[in-house]
Amino acid sequence: MFDKAYVTKDIEQMKLDDRNFPNIIELGFTSHGSDLCGVMLTPQGKGPHPTAILLHGFPGYDDPIDLAHALRRCGMNILRFHYRGSWGVKGSFSFSNCMEDVKSAIDFLTDEKSVKECDIDTNNLFLIGHSMGGFLTLNYACDKRIKASVAISPYDFGLIGKIGNYNQKEKDEAFEMYKTALVPLNNTSAEILMQECLDNGDKWNLPDKAKSLSNEEILITIASRDVVSKRYLHHDILASEIKKYNNNLTEKFIDTDHSYSDKRILVAKTIAQFLEQQINKK
């Protein structure tokens, strides 16, 4: 059973040899011919458990492991993995590959073998992502296997590509960010990544997907002091478009920075409350 109260408290005493003791399972799955490595954090108690894929940002220096543990304590499986071409995973890094890897992760979680081995409740599958992970989350929020999605300060690479042909300031800022992220990435460059955004801007731009997204259960958190996923660019445009079709978008504005550095517990509480509401929906 999922219980949001465990965001801020430890679970009751359990014996280490209890088969339902929390665990971390090292695992791997294949995405377009490449082996991806990851871990599944499994919670206390008997399953099946609601399960979320937790997607890190670009390139992944800001690791949301605290969020993974908080949600695991609440009673949820959490799958974490690195994208192709990042952090020692073989293959080439690209935003397109990241998108494909997310679909591969969903396929993996819904495979009969994974469902059995990890006690997965396939009626309660969720996507949670920060920054680039939020962008990836919103790209797959309409997948019918996903019950609801959480985007934490999503950074819209599609929008950057779409406006990059006429907004030199935003293009230059994005390019400089790409340059700082290359160390853990394989076979790419800031130039390659920027060109990929420019080539795919019309296809990836999230506001253009607003009609479809308006039919989904989505929480977006927004950091008021965020200088990366700037609100006026990466949230307000998208939210305005979604609200033209439906009012079911859940927004949470938090006075913090892009990493939620001083509000980690608050963002975890916010997400846990949203997930509990979704899990309790039939």
In which residue ranges do the predicted regions lie?
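Alpha/beta-hydrolase active-site loop
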Residues: 93-119
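Alpha/beta-hydrolase fold nucleophile elbow
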Residues: 115-131
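The serine-hydrolase catalytic nucleophile loop
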Residues: 57-69, 232
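The alpha/beta-hydrolase serine catalytic core
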Residues: 146-148, 153-247, 252-262, 267-268, ...
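Short glycine-enriched nucleophile-adjacent loop
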Residues: 134-144
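N-terminal cap/lid segment of alpha/beta-hydrolase-fold proteins
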Residues: 2-46
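Short beta-strand element of the alpha/beta-hydrolase
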Residues: 48-57
